Amino acid sequence: KEWHVPVSIGIIWFLWHYHYFYQNGIEVPLLSFFIGCIAESFVYEYLLQWSEGNLLSSMTYHFSWNLCIHLFAINPADNAGNEFPYILMTLFEVSMVLLLLAHDKSRHMHKLPTK
């Protein structure tokens, strides 16, 4: 599995949102946001592969993620500046990526050899 593709997309995605930090549009920790962009890129890649290239799965995940950030007051702008929920959510997502990568590695290890 190529790890550099989701990492590159995560960096580009982070740079795409970077200007919001200077416009006071994003009040989350910069490092956590950067790590989150890369972690989410791995999830999107997994969803795209799982759904055989259907973008709807990734779009639904992105929508759900953004909805949860505001619905459950994870965004520091929604909870009096507390950054802990956002950092915790980022750690959860990194854990999910590690599980997906372990599952993917395990799945490839159990394939029968072909002639």
Residue ranges with predicted function:
Residues K1-S8, Y46-N54:
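Membrane-interface helix/loop boundary segments of multi-pass membrane proteins
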Residues W3-G25:
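Membrane-helix boundary elements
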Residues P6, N24-C37:
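A loop-to-helix transmembrane entry motif
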Residues I11, L15, I38-A39, S95:
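Generic alpha-helical transmembrane segments of integral inner-membrane proteins
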Residues W16, Y20, L48-E52, W65:
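Membrane-water interface at transmembrane helix exits
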Residues F21-V28, P76-N82:
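Membrane-interface helix caps and helix-loop-helix hairpins in membrane proteins
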Residues F34-Y46:
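Hydrophobic alpha-helical segments embedded in the membrane of multi-pass proteins
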Residues L56, T60-K115:
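C-terminal membrane module of polytopic membrane proteins
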